[in-house]
């Protein structure tokens, strides 16, 4: 059976991105790097982030990421949301809205507490709407505020 592996095309910052991702997320490692020449920049790589295998390539300045593709980080709780969010911001990431943040390499991440997914899975549409409305006002997701919106609906 064929296996699907995300292939990330960076303009020229593949090695720096991999170093950051491996240092930031557990269960991460560099598996292979291919350089342009013996001491040249990394051309391609195989790496694991959070247990997920990725392939990467430095493809030149005409390649860039968009929000059309993002990496979703399923966080156990608010503490984990804060940990990853803070690491991304400290590295120069740009927070956007609704738990989304663009890293310094242009890749967009969704840092989402598992509780959010549980709350929007409720069978009561009023509660789901209240949680979604609250989420739409947030930059970094806040579990306590989401639960408050749910409880007050």
Regions found by a protein language model. Give the residues of each.
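Terminal peptide-recognition signature
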Residues: 6, 21, 47, 88, ...
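A structural signal for short, well-ordered beta-strand segments
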Residues: 6-8, 71
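Core segments of cupin and vicinal oxygen chelate
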Residues: 8-52
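Vicinal oxygen chelate
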Residues: 14, 71-108, 112-115, 122, ...
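Serine endopeptidase catalytic core focused on the charge-relay Asp
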Residues: 18, 44, 48-50, 57, ...
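Active-site-proximal beta-strands of protease catalytic cores
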Residues: 24, 29, 53-55, 107-115
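A short acidic/small-residue loop/turn micro-motif
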Residues: 61-62, 115-118
